[in-house]
Amino acid sequence: MFDPTKLSECDVAEFIPHRDPMILISQLLEYSQDSLLTQTDLSTASPYFDPRLNGVPNYVGIEYMAQSIAALAGVEAHLRNDIIRVGFLLGSRKLKMHISQFKLGQSYQTKVTRLYQEESGLAVFDCQILHNQEVVAEANVNVFQPQDTQAYIADAAQ
């Protein structure tokens, strides 16, 4: 049986639909109802690492937020004994990047908190990326998770 108090021992890939090399978050740290804290550890092997910046460009932070939201959905799916579903990043509001890059050798925590969710799968999350307890990026992120991804994609293609 899944124990959310032992998230830090779990493989991130068990909770999100992404696969390497596109898994950007390193660890799930803490779950509470409607909220998840994750960690991203930066190395030269990190996706989007730019040696000219000696880090990852700040705009990748929106994907750290989106993958943390996906991981929250994955934790909730595990708690329901449900499958991991694909979701879609629709956009963001109030996006503020307080740093120009995520630096090599540093760890960043991403906290996502659900503000609103409709039965249709549309949701809004408050997201913050922290470094040493300081907010370095923040946004309200809009996402959509259809109940049947294949049917949704087929309908959208018509």
For each predicted feature, which ranges?
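Single-stranded RNA-binding regions, centering on S1/OB-family and related RNA-binding modules
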Residues: 1-11
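Catalytic strand-loop segment that frames the active site of acyl-thioester-processing enzymes
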Residues: 20-57
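Hydrophobic beta-strand-centered segment that forms part of the acyl-chain substrate-binding groove
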Residues: 5, 71-109
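Compact, glycine-rich, soluble single-domain proteins
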Residues: 53-72, 86-87
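HotDog/MaoC-like acyl-thioester-processing domains
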Residues: 71-74, 103-107, 113-158
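Small-residue-enriched segments and motifs
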Residues: 23-26, 90, 110-112, 139
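Conserved positions in beta-strands of structured domains
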Residues: 26-29, 98, 113-115
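Short aromatic-glycine motifs in intrinsically disordered, low-complexity regions
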Residues: 9-19
